[in-house]
Amino acid sequence: VYGDPNLRTHRAPLPTPPIPVTSGLGNLVEDIASSDGRWWDSARTKAFLDSLSPTQRERMTQLRRGSGVKYRTAYRRTRHGVAVWEVRPDDVSGCLRTARGGSSKQAVVKVGNQRVQIRWMTPREYARLMGAGDYNLGGARPNQALFGFGDAVAVPAVEWLAANYLIPLIKGTIPQMAETLPLAASGV
């Protein structure tokens, strides 16, 4: 791309991006009472657990036996024509997706002390995971909010890019890494 004389391009030196977040989901999950109707009933929870592969089932067994409560996210996938659930092994969320076009919403799995509870992730949790936890969700239906934050660009990523690239570029203070190549005559 940079060597194509038909494209006007430039490069700029950027600092090393922050280290990826590898934990903290439990800090962002809403504290929802065990009696809240958003938690799935026993039949739906059983269907979830029954759909797990042996690897997933073992993961859930280990988490269930552990002391204290842990949170994980889960996705519904189709494997060999059958809908199954996959639970993340770590304390982070998977990619937030919109619930359209074949993608699915994430479920929150609360597990530990021999208990398992499952529910859909809330719009507030989607917002928190995207760095917009204080965003006013008033007036938006839950599915609108999920759609708005699913497949979006996370606020911290945009802030870093703005501070380290866009604002210096606008101010003309970004150092050039390579010469800007002139546009070739387009014949227009």
Question: Which stretches of residues belong to each language-model region?
Answer:
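C-terminal target-recognition/interaction regions appended to catalytic cores
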Residues: 30-188
